[in-house]
Structure formats: structure tokens, C-alpha cells
């Protein structure tokens, strides 16, 4: 995996640290997002007083699979199990629940994993640059939300065929929106626009297909949450057979590598939308 922080700019690092201090922003470590029980109690007491989607920097600590919606604090990873009466198979099928992340999707974590290294290394200067979040879905929402919490200007680049509710929410949290032709499968048009923007030094493109922080965050945070869930629910005769991930930017599926480290015989399986089976047969089309 490429280095998350290949080089440092100490002048911008100092500026970013001063900016965070001035706005009361504390950056959670990846370890704290893996194990939020290790967050200092003083911060936990403040966190439980705010809403999950509030534009409060403390919600950076809620970028975890372990949000407890009853207490406002943290517990075990949120999961569900499909009973054999519904699945029709004897194998136990368990899924993690992502709706209890801020923004309702774990892509907010992938976005944090991409932006955090740039901030702490001085590769991104929010005083002079805008963070650009290209996506057909939840990644640009997560990135814009993270940027709002971190007092960083955000630009969401997404297809014009997405829902008006999505556009309205992005505007509400202060993101600039650039629309490209098409809908879910029109990824090329998004990155054509990003290529155009990349020639302007005032834009920093956070492409989750390229940023190693996407896979790194999912390997550490999603992978450990999956393993912890398996350890919690397994019975003596159970073994971890397979991990299934719907694919897009190949971020979430990196959690499978964590599981293979813990249980080498685990299979990693990629799922694709039937209307757009890109890997299976170069499929292209709109999907839900």
C-alpha cells in the first residue's frame, strides 16, 4: 500500500493545527474510531449531548461502527442476522449496519481516512484550497460532512441525475456543487471534471479510487468491527467462511484483507449491481 503520508509541509501543518485549535476541533485517531471506548471520558460526556448529524466537530468521534443510539455513546458494532427461515440456507449470514454513522453511511469514514492524512501532513491547506469530493453516491456526502466539521471548504462533484434531496442536503451543510451529465454509471464524466479542476492549485481532489486512505480506513475500522462481531456471535462449531462486499471504489472490500489476516481461509466475495456488472462482463447502466 502507498504511504498515507509520503512527505510533510511543516508550515501548513502548523497552520492547520492552529486552525483546529481556534475552532475547537480535535482529530480522532483511527484507533479511537476502532475502539471509541478509549475516547477520554470528558469528551464522551460532551458527545452524548449532541445529535448524530449535527455539524459539531465532536461528531468526528462518531465515525465508527459502534454508535449506541440509546445512550448516545458507544457499544458493540451494530449488526443484524438473517435467519435461515428467510435466507433458505443453514449458514449464518450477518451484516454490519451502517445507518448509525453520521450521514447514515460508512462512506463518511472512508472520506475521513482520505482527508486526515492530507491535513496532518500539510498536503492540504483549507485556507487556500478546496477539498473536492467526486462520487455518484455517499462518498461525496461523507466528504462534505467531514469537511464541514473540519472547517474545510468542500466541493461535491456528482451526476445531475441524482436526487434533489441529496443536492439540497449538500447545499444545507455549505458544500459547493458541480453537476456532471448522467447518473450512477456516469463515473467518467465526474473524473473528466476532476481532471479539469486538478490543474488549478486551489483544488485538492480526494479521489477515493486513488487515495489509499479509503482502503486503509476500511481495513482498520471496518475489518476490526467485522472480526469483533464474529467473535461475539460465533458458536463452537462456527467458522468464518466468507466476507461479501458490494463494490465501487474497492474501499470496503479491504476489510476482507483484515479478516483473512485473522482467519486465512476466509473467502472475499465482491457483489455488483445486476444492472451494472462492471467486473463480471464490463456492464454499464443505471442501478439502485
Please provide the spans of the model-predicted regions.
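PLP-dependent amino-acid enzyme catalytic core
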Residues: 1-288
Amino acid at each position: 500500500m502507498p504511504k498515507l503520508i509520503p512527505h510533510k509541509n511543516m508550515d501548513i501543518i502548523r497552520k492547520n493545527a492552529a486552525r483546529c485549535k481556534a475552532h475547537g476541533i480535535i482529530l480522532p485517531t483511527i484507533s479511537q474510531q476502532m475502539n471509541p471506548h478509549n475516547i477520554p471520558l470528558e469528551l464522551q460526556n460532551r458527545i452524548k449531548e449532541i445529535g448524530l448529524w449535527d455539524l459539531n466537530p465532536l461528531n468526528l468521534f462518531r465515525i465508527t461502527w459502534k454508535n449506541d443510539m440509546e445512550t448516545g455513546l458507544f457499544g458493540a458494532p451494530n449488526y443484524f442476522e438473517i435467519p435461515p427461515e428467510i435466507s433458505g440456507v443453514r449458514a449464518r449470514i450477518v451484516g454490519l449496519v451502517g445507518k448509525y454513522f453520521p450521514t447514515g453511511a460508512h462512506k463518511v469514514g472512508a472520506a475521513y481516512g482520505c482527508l486526515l492524512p492530507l491535513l496532518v501532513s500539510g498536503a492540504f491547506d483549507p485556507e487556500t484550497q478546496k477539498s473536492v469530493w467526486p462520487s455518484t453516491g455517499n462518498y461525496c456526502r461523507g466528504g462534505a460532512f467531514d469537511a464541514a466539521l473540519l472547517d474545510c471548504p468542500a466541493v461535491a462533484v456528482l451526476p445531475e441525475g441524482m436526487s434533489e434531496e441529496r443536492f439540497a442536503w449538500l447545499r444545507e451543510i455549505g458544500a459547493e456543487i458541480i453537476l456532471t451529465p448522467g447518473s450512477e454509471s456516469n463515473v467518467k464524466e465526474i473524473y473528466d471534471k476532476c481532471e479539469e479542476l486538478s490543474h488549478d492549485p486551489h483544488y485538492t481532489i480526494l479521489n477515493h479510487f486513488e487515495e489509499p486512505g479509503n482502503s486503509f480506513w476500511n481495513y482498520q475500522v471496518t475489518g476490526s468491527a467485522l472480526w469483533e462481531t464474529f467473535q461475539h456471535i460465533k458458536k463452537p462449531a462456527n467458522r468464518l467462511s466468507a466476507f461479501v462486499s458490494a463494490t465501487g471504489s474497492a474501499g470496503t472490500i479491504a476489510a476482507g484483507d483484515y479478516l483473512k489476516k485473522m482467519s486465512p481461509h476466509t473467502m472475499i466475495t465482491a457483489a455488483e449491481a445486476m444492472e451494472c456488472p462492471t467486473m463480471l462482463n464490463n456492464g454499464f447502466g443505471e442501478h439502485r
